[in-house]
Amino acid sequence: MNEVGLKDQCFGVEVELTGITREQAAQALADYFGTVPRRDDDYYDSWYVKDEMGKEWRLMSDSSIRGEQKVGARYTSTSDPRYRVEMVTPKLTYAELPKFQECVRRVRTAGGKVNSSCGIHVHVDAANHNRQSLKNLLGIMYSKEDILFKALQVNSYRIANYCQKVREPMLQKARKLSSEETKNLTQLETIWYEGDNGSTEHYN
């Protein structure tokens, strides 16, 4: 397998925000893409917007967000769940990074904002990775995550509940796997999920 460069890496992003409703955020994206937003009456009261490539961007509810709305020139707290917005991108390529950046700008211009309850999640496509590259990635993350967490000012509540650090026992077990033991990802998954494969669980 050829080495995967940054420009070959696909990704997806979840951006949590408030200040505007999901409908307003969807309209901001639709205006940018030249399309029409679509509401889906699902559990998350989602709105969908197709971009110029036909990919769907989702605006969904997230109960962990502390809602705010603009009243006059100021933002004030609100219990209205429509102001709890999570913007979920489709699978994107490196070349689409400027499009993602412009979407963030459009939502911000429409009145979107963040507060301490908001976060951002970046999902990296593992399709071009193998067992060894994932083991290497685990080691790199372990060695750099304290610097990253400090630079991003991740608060202790989020560390405990949503973005736990790599645990050293997990790292040591992964490093000890031989090439024979990692012909498939099953054993590496077992180590990552610390027993049962919880890959279908939300925070894994």
Predicted regions and their residues:
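C-terminal accessory/tail domains of diverse enzymes
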Residues: 1-114, 127-204
